[in-house]
C-alpha cells in the first residue's frame, strides 16, 4: 500500500493524490475564509489585531491558489485526463510527476509553519516590501513563506515541463495539434505560462530573502534599491498566474458543454484554441494594471489600460462560442450542466467588473477596495471553483466507476450558487462606498452589507459540507456504472469505469475521413 502511493509512477494514482491533497487544502482554505468573514460580520474586533487578521488573509490566498485550485485543476484533472484524451500510456516523465506531487505537502507545511511562528506573515499574498522586509516583519515567518513558495514553484515548473513534453511527443501518429481536445490545449497553454512566469517569481522572492537575511538592498531605497521593482517582478508572475488558474477551467467547461449539448465538438473549436493562446500571450503584457497607483507615466497607464481591455476580446469569443455550442439543443439540466451554465454567467459578471477596473483613472479610486476583492472572487470563487465542481461531478464516474446522487447534487449546486453570490455581490457596493481591503475593522456605515456577505459565506460552508456528504454517500453506496452514455468523440470514456491501471496497451489510431 505504501509503495503504491508513495512511489507511484501511474498518472491516475498521482492524479488521485492531487485530488485528495487539493480537497484537504480546500477545506483548510475555506476554514480560513470563514474566519475572515466571522471577523468582518460585525464592526469591532473579534479575533485580534490586524496582524493576525492579515496572516489569516495571506494564508487563505496562498492555500486556495497554490494548494487547492492548481493541484486540483492541473495536478488532478490534468494528470487524469491529458494522457487518456491523448491516448498516451502515461505522462512523459512518470517519476518526475510523482516528485511534483510530493513537493507539495512539505510546501504547505512550511506555509502553515510561517503563520504559527513569531507573528505570522501578515503581508497579503503579494508580500510587498517594505512591509515584508525585516524591519516590519522581523521574525522567520516571511522566510518560511518564501521557502514554501519556492517548493510550490519547483513543483509547478516540473509539472509544466512534464505536460508540455507529453503533449508535444505523446500524441497519436496522425493527430495534428488542432485535433487535440480543448482540455489538452488548455493544460498545455497553462503549462507554458507556468514555465515562463514562475522563474520570475522565484527571482523576486529570492531577492526579498537576501534583502531580509544577507543585508542586500534590492528593494531598499537606502542602498539604491526600489520596492517598485519587486512589484513589477511579482506582478509579471502574478498576472499570468490568474490566467493559469482559469485556463484549465475553460478547457473543462468546453468539454462539459459540448458533451451535455450532444454535440461532437465545441462551436468554433479552432477559434477557441486561438482565443486561449491570445489570452495566454496577452496575460504577460498587462501586469502593471495592478500598479496604477504607484505613480506611472500617463502614457504607460494608457497602454496598460488598453492592453488589459483587449483581453476581453478573446474571452468574449470563448463565452459566445460556449453559448453557440448550447444553441439549438434541448438543455438537460444535469448537475454538470448547471455548473457550466453558472460558470458562463458568473465568469462573465466577473469579467465585466474586470473591464471596469482596467480603466486606470477609475482604478485609482477602486484600488485596494472591496470592489477588487469582489472582482477576483467572482472569477475565482465562481469561475475556477465552479469549473472544478462541474468537472468533478462530470468525470467522477470515470475516475471511480460510481455515480453521485443527482438530486442531492442539484440541491448542493443551488445552495452554493446562492451562498457565493450572497457573499461577493454586496462587496461591489462596499468597494464603491470606499471600504478598503485587508483591514479587520470598518466604520459602522458598512455594517449591513458586511452582515449579508458573512451570511452568504455561512451558506457556502453548508454547501461545501453537503458536497463532501454527497461524495461520502456515493463511496459507501457504490452504485456501479455498467456502461457510459457518452459520445464517441470523447475518447477518455472508452476506458473501463474506472480505467485499468494501464489504460492503453496499444496505441490508438486516428483515422481521417
Swiss-Prot record:
Binding residue positions for Mg(2+): 367-368
Keywords: Calcium, Copper, Electron transport, Heme, Iron, Magnesium, Membrane, Metal-binding, Mitochondrion, Mitochondrion inner membrane, Respiratory chain, Translocase, Transmembrane, Transmembrane helix, Transport
Transmembrane segments: 16-36, 62-82, 101-121, 144-164, 182-202, 233-253, 267-287, 304-324, 337-357, 379-399, 413-433, 451-471
Entries under InterPro entries matching the protein: Cyt_c_oxase-like_su1_dom, Cyt_c_oxase-like_su1_sf, Cyt_C_Oxase_1, Cyt_c_Oxase_su1_BS, Cyt_c_oxase_su1_dom
GO MF annotation: an example: cytochrome-c oxidase activity
Name of a matching Pfam family: COX1
Cofactor, how bound (note): Binds 2 heme A groups non-covalently per subunit.
Record PROSITE patterns: COX1, COX1_CUB
Keyword Transmembrane (UniProt): yes
Enzyme class, UniProt record, top EC level: translocase
Keyword check for Transport: yes
Record field: catalytic activity: 4 Fe(II)-[cytochrome c] + O2 + 8 H(+)(in) = 4 Fe(III)-[cytochrome c] + 2 H2O + 4 H(+)(out)
SUPFAM superfamilies attached to this UniProt entry: Cytochrome c oxidase subunit I-like
Residues annotated as binding Ca(2+): 39, 44
Residues noted as binding Fe(II)-heme a in the record, renumbered to the chain: 60, 377
UniProt function note: Component of the cytochrome c oxidase, the last enzyme in the mitochondrial electron transport chain which drives oxidative phosphorylation. The respiratory chain contains 3 multisubunit complexes succinate dehydrogenase (complex II, CII), ubiquinol-cytochrome c oxidoreductase (cytochrome b-c1 complex, complex III, CIII) and cytochrome c oxidase (complex IV, CIV), that cooperate to transfer electrons derived from NADH and succinate to molecular oxygen, creating an electrochemical gradient over the inner membrane that drives transmembrane transport and the ATP synthase.
Family label: Belongs to the heme-copper respiratory oxidase family.
Name used for this protein in its record: Cytochrome c oxidase subunit 1
Organism: Choristoneura occidentalis biennis (Two-year-cycle budworm moth)
